[in-house]
């Protein structure tokens, strides 16, 4: 997962704010301080699951993450290769919500620095800007 552009970034932040553990068949990601954070408490699978995997995945989640009574969800994530499909109708029939997240990445060879005409005007922050910035952040 370390070379997948989306998951590598997620795992960077997951390690910063929580725990990432590599198991034989998947990774566990836990954010103990945020039990209701679906994408901070999940199993990360190397390949898409099938309906046959539902039982052992749920048991693994419950044993490694869901033992905390504050966690009242199960979340599984996995990468999809181009043209690959997930076969998770059994999960959906059991009440799981299926969603796909897309990652757009541009390699160093394709990246072009913006030209002067592409740049938006910018100014440094002043002391007076900070109150407005803090209000915006909340």
Identify the role of each PLM range.
Residues 1-69, 82-84:
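N-terminal charged segments
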Residues 51-130:
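Acyl-donor-binding surface of acyltransferase catalytic domains
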Residues 68, 136-138:
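Helix-loop element at the rim of GNAT/NAT acetyltransferase active sites that forms part
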């Amino acid at each position: 997962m370390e070379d997948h552009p989306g998951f590598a970034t997620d795992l960077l932040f997951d390690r910063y704010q929580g725990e990432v553990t590599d198991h034989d068949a998947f990774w566990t990601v836990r954010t103990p301080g945020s039990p209701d954070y679906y994408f901070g408490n999940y199993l990360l699978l190397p390949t898409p699951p099938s309906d046959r995997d539902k039982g052992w995945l749920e048991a693994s989640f419950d044993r490694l993450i869901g033992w905390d009574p504050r966690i009242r969800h199960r979340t599984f994530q996995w990468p999809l290769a181009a043209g690959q499909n997930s076969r998770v109708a059994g999960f959906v029939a059991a009440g799981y919500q299926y969603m796909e997240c897309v990652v757009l990445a541009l390699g160093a060879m394709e990246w072009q620095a913006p030209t002067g005409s592409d740049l938006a005007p910018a100014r440094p922050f002043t002391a007076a800007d900070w109150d407005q910035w803090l209000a915006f952040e909340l």
